[in-house]
Amino acid sequence: MNTSEKKTGSCGKSGTSLDRREFMKAGASGALAMMCGASFAGTPGAAGTDLMTQYSEVIIDAMRDIVKDERANILKAADLLSDNANEGRLIHVYGAGGHSAIAAMEIFWRAGGLACVNGMFPVGTNVMTAGPTTAKVEGFAPYIFSFYDVNKGDTLILVNFYGLNITAVDMALEAKKRGVKLITINAQKFAKKVPKSFKWRHSSKLDINDLADIAIDNHVPYPDAILKVKGLKEEITPTATILTCFTINCLMSETIRMMVEKGGKPEIWVSNNIPNCDEHNKPIHDKYRHRVHHLYPVW
């Protein structure tokens, strides 16, 4: 698509025409607003490219906003995590509710990632193993903390796309009780839009960032899905997974950099699909296997 192409009205603003350059300069929030009144006409003969272009523009703008607006808190969190890791502590990560576990998985036992990450994936609290109610019942947090051996002085990265999931808030409250430092990653503006009376909120009516020592915003827009299709009432195509994974990878990148700058020697996984991977990964795996629950035996 070249810069002279226009967007034509589709979502209730018939006749709207916006230059692509104007769209690109609008930032994430402006782009979202524009998309409600216009869609890209696309390159002639390239059927189906309109929504791909819209989606990429919004995601890229949001990523830039994360780097700009969350920089201070990401660096503050990385400073804390790098100290913990250099002291020999594990970095605990829990993705609470639905698909939020994906972001926790993104930094656990992952190529280019730290070996000292303790991924917490209890049965019943994510989309793969949850029953109809288990992820929405209060009272699981103490058992999760004990099972994964999260102790006073440790740090927990608590990920919940929107920040109001019942299990997530339960985990945040338990962290405060146990003297565990809490880093949260969630969509803070999204959480504010959800009424306190919403039936799937925690009884405390809190969001996880209300309890955080360091709160990082993943800049997920409300209501997560962002694209419009003419003739369809619902928005389509979510943003939460890609933006949250980007955010947590920014955090871990800075953590590893700071570990090295402070004189540490971070142990980094390499891909299990490249030559000599076993020679590199097996000694690291052997070191952490009895401390990290989900490092199951592979050799």
Located regions from the model:
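N-terminal export leaders
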Residues: 20-33
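N-terminal secretory signal peptides
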Residues: 1-18, 36
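Glycine-rich phosphate-binding loops that contact phosphosugars or nucleotide phosphates
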Residues: 93-252
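Internal, active-site/partner-interface "lid" segment
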Residues: 224-228, 258-281
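Flexible, glycine/charged-enriched surface loops at secondary-structure junctions
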Residues: 73-77, 93-95, 260-269
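C-terminal segment of N-terminal export signals and the immediately downstream linker at the start
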Residues: 16, 38-61
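A short, well-structured juxtamembrane/interface segment
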Residues: 69-84
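Acidic, Ser/Thr-rich low-complexity intrinsically disordered segments
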Residues: 275-299
